[in-house]
Structures are given as C-alpha cells and as structure tokens.
C-alpha cells in the first residue's frame, strides 16, 4: 500500500547552519516539510512513527522559526498550517457541483452476478463484458476536496448528497491530506473525493487517553472520525489521528486517463493515500478477491465494511449513467452480517412520543459488527410472545451494516429453570397511568397523554428534529435538561427560551456562546413550511408524506384544523384511523393553545400552491411510486403526477389506480399484482407526462 520510507532525522539536518539566500532558505524549508510529512503519514496512518517525539518537535520548531523569519517564503503545504485555527461559529452549507451519490448494495454471490448481468444487459451486445475495479469500502466519512491550480481550497462533507457542510478548516489538520499538489498546479479545478477515517491504532490510543481522563469514549472509529470533523474548534480535529484516503476524481482528471484504476494510480502519484485496488473480469474473480480480503480484514490498519466494485472503463461508466440516487456502474459488496450469542438479562419498557410502550432488552454487552451492543429493541408485546423470549435467556443478536441490532433467535434449550413469561405492564413505568392494548393493534399505549413526562420529552425531541423544525444544535440531552429545569414544558416554550438566557448559561457545560447559537437556531427555524410544521406537531399516524399531503390538500393550517373527518379522508394516505386522530388532535384545547402560541411567537411559512385537479388528465386517480427511476428522482415524478391531477400515496390498496415501478421494485410490486393494480413502467410514465 505504501513504499518504504527512509526519512531524514534531525541528526541529518544542520538546523544551526546559517542560510544566506532565498533558494537555500526554500531548500531548507522543503527538507523540514518533506520529513515532517513523512513522519505524519507514518504516525497517523500507519501507526509506525519514524521519528522520536523530541526529534519531531525539534524539526517543527526549526521550520516554524524559518517561517517566522521569512514569511514571504512560506511553502503552501507546510505542516505548520495543520494545527487548527480559531473556533468556527457554525458550518456553512455548500451545494456540490456534482452530487455525491450513495451506492447500491449486494450481500451475496448471486446478487453480485445479478449486478454484473444488469451491467452487461445495458451495454451493447457487441461489447465484451467489461473489466471491474475493486476497492476497499472504507468505514469513515465521505468528503469532497477541491484544489485550484494545486492549492487546497475547500473540503465539504457528503451531507444529503446534494448539499454538505464546509469543513475546510478541520480538513486542513488531517496529517496525510496534501495542502499543495505541485503536479496539479496546471489544473484549474481538481476535485478529489474520498473517506476521512481514523486508523484502528489511533482510535484505541484516543479512547485510552479519554478513559484515563474519565472522558466519554467513542463507540467505533467511524463515529470518532465523524465527530472529530464536526468540531467547531479545528484544534480539536488537529489533535485527533485522522487520515484521508481518496477513491475518485470528479473534476480535473487528465484526458489521457481512461480507467478508474489508472485514475487512482495517478492521484496516488500526486500525493494522496489510496487503498488497495484489484482489477477483475468476472463474478468468480471478484468473489475470490472479496473472500481474500475477508480473510485478511482483521490485519488492515483501518475498519472496512465491504468492497466497492466499479466498471473500470470511465467511458463505459458514462454510457451506463445513473439511477436517481446511485450509479449503475458501481455497487458495494457488503461483508456478511454478524450474529453473536449473548444473555438477555432483563426487559425494560420505554414510553414513546405518542404513548407507545416499547420493550427494550438489556443484554450482556457484546461486540456485533464492530459496535458494542448492550440494548436491543423487542418492538412490541406481540414480538415478545412470537419469540417467546424471557429475562435470562440466551439470544442471537444480528446486525447488518448500519441496521439496528435485533434478536433473531432465542435458545430455549438453554433457558433457566426459574424463568417466567414476560407480562405487559398494567400501568405506565413513568407516570403510572393505565396501559391499554387496543384490539387489532400491536402496540400497547400509555393513556397519560401529555400528562406523562416521557411523552412530553419525546414530543419536544421530535419537534426540533431535522425533518421537523430542524433546530440545529438543540439536541435531546439539552432539551431534557431544559425540561427537567422547568424551562420548557410544551413545544411553544422553545420559542420563549430567549427570555431565559441567564438561566441557560448557568446549566452545566452550556456557555454563553452555545446559548447564543441555540437561540439563533431557534429564531431561524421560525420560517418553515406548512408540511414540516404539521409533521413537527407529532400527530399520531401523520408521518412526513402524510404531512405533505395534508399541506397540499388544504393549503392552509386553519382550513386543516377546521376540516371534518370526511374532508380529511379525501387526502391521499389518510385512512379512517388517521383522519379521526387528526380530527381529535385539532380539537383538543391544549393543542389549539400550543399552536396559537407558536404562531404568536412568529412561526410562519410561505403560502402553499395548491394543485386544482378538476379537469386534469389524472383527476381522481391515486398513484404509488416504487423503485429507482432512471430519468428523475421520485419526488420529481411525484410532482409531475400531481401536476396532472393525481393523488400520490405511499401504500398500495384496492383503491390504487396505478403503480409506477422503477428499478429494484420491491414488495409493492407483488402487492399490486395480487390486487390487480395496473403497473406502469418508466417509459410509459414518461410518455404520459410528455417527456
């Protein structure tokens, strides 16, 4: 992966020798810089330092003295610039020039063959099966770096793929990330994408130091890397053992390079770290290499969670193109999910935002997929009965990728003799209100409503969440603290926190600057959309899609609040139960009072442009969309259907007019066929909407 390093040491450099001209000064600076960069790579990436700490410090001091004496000769890639800067007030949002798409996944050999077959089917019959390039799927944070005429100018996280956060100041502190590319000085704009990660040895060292200081440790290297990059104070990022590995060139690639493997070889030559690469010709060769990496995975210096397989030819990548969220020419071949056995010591009951009582299994802590798991959701009382799980049982816990761990098996033959079946609690574990399990429902519920502190807290957390009012920086821990200190009881109280700034500052670890940031974020959230506001209210049964449909259907909050059940039922995705729940919600005096207080505090939204469907081609029709579309994102397809008068629902029923099915259509396709619902392909859809 890297060439052997034979660095200079401080003994090889005469730091006391007088320097008499600019060329000699620059030569001396370059000697210091190159040696320090070699050490940084060996220390932070390979965890194999090539200098003693004292030698490193001496070289760094010598370079700093030269730079202070000759500021006009400071080199652009000097590691002196990689120690952190002033704390940032917040991260700026940046739109990617080219979206940073995610990858599809395959999990077994047959999936891999299907992926390669789909690639072949899309290519000309006359073409031979393409070569594929395989890379390690690094388990870190995806980042885009930009260089203008060789000089590093910007680093942006993936974010949602369209927009990310500007982390330039933190990225400058990554020791193996070049700040200057001499071989790219003639390239106007070079964009290199890759993964910021924390090597295993550095992660263990970081956690060991944190434990010694009785500070919080990180769960895994990925969390540590992501948390380090999102520090507002770059000096914190500078103190963390981060590394950057490049995996693509998105702008500025030389015209002479025509394959992905050649592109990675080039960016390695100009100064970037690149993971191992293998070129294969068919599924069997790919599987052989995949299995060889699994066998040696534990010996790698960093965490990986699979392989990335790409069509090697850049021209064929262009020909194959993209789905709405992922390329057709690449996929991630994930490693097998991990399943381990452990003991379930107890079952606790938690209360959710709408009163649902959820059982949580308390496990003997065990490592699954690189993460220590001590809790596992058991979903509901029906699931407990289905599994026949009891406190004291040995259970199998399964985790695949980032999926929440779950119990997949109970080892009944190892059950303790004195075990007893789990009983549904008759009263709420938080407020002692009666618990009910409605007929034909899986979830038991606390009847305490907003009298229940647990429901109050969960309602507050939901209200500020990213997809609701999106109040950045006001996390669950602070909200619970504010609640416990009596500063907020309802969501409307959040908009009165500016009146309690002195009290907020006195709370543990919350300084004036943090308080000011929270107040600013609250103020910024006042301008929202009607659909976000409806979703933020936390009406039972009203998710994001239903909130959007209600906003589109009524166009105005007052019209929605005064709507009858019959009118609510005209909204796509709103059935009898949801209509009744929404109707009762908007007539509860407490809810009316909170909504009024929110509006009086200045929460507002732009007018919703309603679609008048009468007379339009699809008036009266209900459509459902499933799978990935080639020509556009699903939200765009939804908008086009609505523009023609259709209602777009999220679920298939006998009332559905048609199902628009894209690539990888799943269970909705099977349900549509079972119910006799018409299935429309993408070409037919494009003809329908006139494209």
Swiss-Prot record:
GO terms for biological process: DNA repair; DNA replication. Belongs to the NAD-dependent DNA ligase family. LigA subfamily. SUPFAM superfamilies: BRCT domain, DNA ligase/mRNA capping enzyme, catalytic domain, Nucleic acid-binding proteins, RuvA domain 2-like. It comes from the Bacteria. It holds the Pfam family DNA_ligase_ZBD. It comes from Psychrobacter arcticus (strain DSM 17307 / VKM B-2377 / 273-4). Keywords: DNA damage, DNA repair, DNA replication, Ligase, Magnesium, Manganese, Metal-binding, NAD, Zinc. This is DNA ligase. It catalyses: NAD(+) + (deoxyribonucleotide)n-3'-hydroxyl + 5'-phospho-(deoxyribonucleotide)m = (deoxyribonucleotide)n+m + AMP + beta-nicotinamide D-nucleotide. Zn(2+) binds at residues 428, 431, 446, 452. The gene is ligA. Its EC number is 6.5.1.2. PANTHER family: CHROMOSOME TRANSMISSION FIDELITY FACTOR 18 (PTHR23389), DNA LIGASE (PTHR23389:SF9). GO terms for cellular component: cytosol. GO terms for molecular function: DNA binding; DNA ligase (NAD+) activity; metal ion binding. NAD(+) binds at residues 53-57, 102-103, 135, 158, 195, 310, 334. The active site is at 137 (n6-amp-lysine intermediate). Its cofactor is Mg(2+); Mn(2+). DNA ligase that catalyzes the formation of phosphodiester linkages between 5'-phosphoryl and 3'-hydroxyl groups in double-stranded DNA using NAD as a coenzyme and as the energy source for the reaction. It is essential for DNA replication and repair of damaged DNA. Residues 613-691 form the BRCT domain. It is an enzyme of class 6 (ligase).
